C-alpha cells in the first residue's frame, strides 16, 4: 500500500503533481512553476508542500528531460488552439507573453504557423455580422472594433474591404 501523502518526500510529491498537471494539457514553464508553488487542497483544507527551491528546479529539469515540458510545443499548440477560437495574432502574442514565453519564441512560432490571418479576420467578421459585410462607415467601424478586440491587426482588417469587390 502506498504511504500517506504527507510522509512522502517533498520532491516526490512535487514530481507527482507536475506530471498530473502536464497530463491534462501543455503548460509553459512559468505556468507550471506557479501551479506547483500554489497550495494543494487536502482533506483538511489547503496544504503547502514544504519543498526547497532545489526541489522545484529538479522537478522542472526532470520534466524537460522527459519531454513533459516543452515551451516550443506549448507555443505551437497554443497558437493553433487560440486561432481556432477566432483570436488574432496580437491577442495571441499578448497571452503568450503573460504565460512567460519569450518574444523571440513567440515570433518564431508565429512565422512558422501557416495561418492566413486576414482570412481568419474575414471569417470572424462574417460569423458575427453576416454576409455581405456592412459597407457603410458606422457599421464598418463596429466590425473593425470587434476584430481589433479579438486581436487582429489593422492591415488584416482593412484587407477584408480591399478584397470586397472580389
UniProtKB/Swiss-Prot annotation:
The gene is recX. HAMAP family: RecX (MF_01114). It comes from the Bacteria. One of its GO terms (biological process) is regulation of DNA repair. Belongs to the RecX family. The keyword Cytoplasm applies. This is Regulatory protein RecX. The lineage of its organism: Bacteria, Pseudomonadati, Pseudomonadota, Gammaproteobacteria, Enterobacterales. One of its GO terms (cellular component) is cytoplasm. It comes from Salmonella schwarzengrund (strain CVM19633). It is found in: Cytoplasm.
